Amino acid sequence: MINKRKQFVLGLAGACVMGLAGTPAVSADLAEIQKNGVLRVAVANEIPYGYMDVNGEAKGVGPDVAKHIAEALGIKKIEWTTTNFGSLIPGLKANRYDMVAAEMAILPQRCEQVLFSEPNSSYGEGLLVAKGNPKDIHDYESFAQSDHKIAIMAGADQLEMLQALKVPESRIVTISNNADAISTVSTGRADGYAATSLTVGELASKSDKVEAAQNFKDPVVNGTPVRSWGGFTFDKDSTALRDAVNTELAKFKKTPTWEKILTGYGFSAEDAKGSFTKTTAELCAK
């Protein structure tokens, strides 16, 4: 996740924050969004899930699919915001944007705070290590059985995985964004960085000081290999918008264009098929 901390709608976000100072946040409803012709969408600058390119254009699986959905809903304009991953949900709850297109993993604890669409993607885990993998680490479980330290991004669901694997807190290094992962691992502050396989691959391609751990073994939690399902995220009051997105998403996922978007960003055909294997209701259930 490469976080450039760049805000592309400063005026809009600032106005929202000022308006929130004295009154509770009230999410825009679908009818209002369609009337105004503007959908406010946030990403966390995580390649390939949702990010802004050097030209200021929204890219990634989430944004590309969101553009098709917005068009289908008759919404002519999307105003994009970038923020840290850990700020995505608070920003939704504060009405700084209407929707998040970051392929955020659908998890029970998140479902208590926000609404999710049905899954748009599925993806597995990976591990970023120093070049040559000097500590010979190939799984998350190793960090529970040694003195090695593992880094994670603040707000990411890898924390729950590591806790389930009994990795002590003293061995977990929290960083603010994916951009810091390369230096964190290459300088030895941590011996590995836990993230999705796609994120790890993207980071490894940016520096010859790190690499993706080969022969990585997916973490097994409660007897089940870990796989995540990502979707669009909404405030709890945005039921109509969520439902409308679900309707259009279901239609779009039946087209070859949808799968082409996923595979174009490095998802496998199996990842695309995997998005159909779970419902949001199942993923939100404890």
Report the location of each language-model feature.
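Extracytoplasmic small-molecule ligand-binding "clamshell" domains
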Residues: 28-103, 112, 264
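A ligand-binding cleft/hinge motif common to bilobed small-molecule-binding domains
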Residues: 87, 103-112, 161-164, 191-226, ...
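Flexible hinge/capping segments at coil-to-helix
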Residues: 131-149
